[in-house]
């Protein structure tokens, strides 16, 4: 009986510790306007957290809105 109680308490403690983990957020959030009609044709490449190079930050925002994704800017420049 004592062994079962100790086992149960240990299992609960491990489950509690496992539930407290948080996901690490990678990259910088893109500066996206609330209304996005179109994007300028300026070439100022950004590397998304999906490993794809976008022509500019606006294009990344447009793709996020179009496909319902939340790709962030990993860095400025080509991937």
Curated annotation (Swiss-Prot):
Disulfide bonds join 32-61, 39-58, 47-79. The keyword Phosphoprotein does not apply. Residues 1-23 form the signal peptide. Its main location: secreted. GO terms for cellular component: extracellular region. The record marks 43-44 as: Necessary for sperm binding. It is found in: Secreted. The record marks 41-42 as: Reactive bond for trypsin. Seminal vesicle. One of its GO terms (molecular function) is serine-type endopeptidase inhibitor activity. Transmembrane segments: none annotated. Serine protease inhibitor which exhibits anti-trypsin activity. In the pancreas, protects against trypsin-catalyzed premature activation of zymogens. In the male reproductive tract, binds to sperm heads where it modulates sperm capacitance by inhibiting calcium uptake and nitrogen oxide (NO) production. This is Serine protease inhibitor Kazal-type 1-like. It comes from Rattus norvegicus. The gene is Spink1l.
